[in-house]
Amino acid sequence: MKNIFIGGVAKSGKSTLAKKLCKDEKYNHIPVDYFTASFKRNYPDVGIISNVVVNEETSTKLSLFLSTVIGIIDTTDEKFIIDSAHINPKDIIKYLDRDKWDIYYIGYPNTTKEEKFNIIRKYETNDDWTYKRSDEVLLDTLDKLIDISKKQEKDCLELGIEYVDTSLGMDMLYD
């Protein structure tokens, strides 16, 4: 059993998959987005931004931050799942030993912003970040996330990282 890194855009199914794997197997879960929010709030000078849309500078800095965590994890017998919406494949790949880590990216490159919007609004709760967004702002954000999904899918293909397309739903996460 290897450690698992799950990256990808917001609302793609990363946390859902991580929670399922933790329930079924003996994994510890590290949601990097919690740390991203903490960096933004407590250490703004570091320049790590906790936005829904991945930022190149944040991706690079978070990957470097995680490199130490990954190094420590690599020396333990415990198994971990790290998930993040703030790290691009090209930034994290240099820190993950593929003999010790399975790497997955999840996104929705083959949908429209309207289709994804309807799915999100149908299933969201008042705890979801999307609940606080106006329809117009959410549609604009989804347009950007679809573009990022397409780029990450392309990068994953070039880097030999498994990419899971949840454009048609999240059923494939459980196969």
Where in this protein do the model-derived segments appear?
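NTP-dependent small-molecule kinase module
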Residues: 147-175
